[in-house]
Amino acid sequence: MLAFTETAFSCASPRRVVLDTNVLVSLYVFEDSRFAPLRARIESGEWQAISNEACFEEFRRVLGYAMFALTEERQQAALAAYGAVVTRFAEPPAVAAAALPRCADRDDQKFLELARDAAADWLVTADKALLKLARRDRLRGLFRILTPERALTDV
């Protein structure tokens, strides 16, 4: 199991972002040039990428999908690159938390919960089920849900 790296940032207050698995695959597998500035902002410390064990484990699992045909070495390289810059968020103690809308895809609910619990500024996703929730009143004052394209323009 890959350990998360504790990362110190020189920025006074980096933007706290949660990246869903599809975005991570674009950044760390395909190295999508359209989104290279997202990765650069994370690696420079301008943005603080946040994950927890459940979200990181989903990334690990998806890297093994046959459709990507990634070697074990390539999977480990992607995990190591992200693991080197992500801040691990430990699960908070059970306390009353702000209510969240329910995502149509139950597997994506963990990203909403992480964004709320880690006090993220943004949840960056290309997932339609998550993007549908972007305008929900329950999210106001908590965090924004943005596409990668929008995250690049809303700096």
What are these regions (language model features)?
Residues M1-S51:
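Short, well-structured N-terminal submotif of metal-dependent ribonuclease cores
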Residues L24-V25, E57, L130-K132:
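Short, active-site-adjacent cap segments at secondary-structure transitions
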Residues S26-Y28, A98-A104:
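Short, flexible loop segments at the rims of nucleotide/cofactor-binding pockets, characterized by
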Residues L38, F111-L112:
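Short, hydrophobic alpha-helical packing/hinge segments within bilobed ligand-binding/sensory domains
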Residues R41-E46, I50-A98:
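PIN-domain endoribonuclease scaffold, especially VapC-family toxins
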Residues E53-A54, A126-K128:
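Short secondary-structure boundary segments
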Residues P101, D105, Q109, R116-W122, ...:
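Acidic, PIN/NYN-like endoribonuclease modules and their adjacent C-terminal/linker elements
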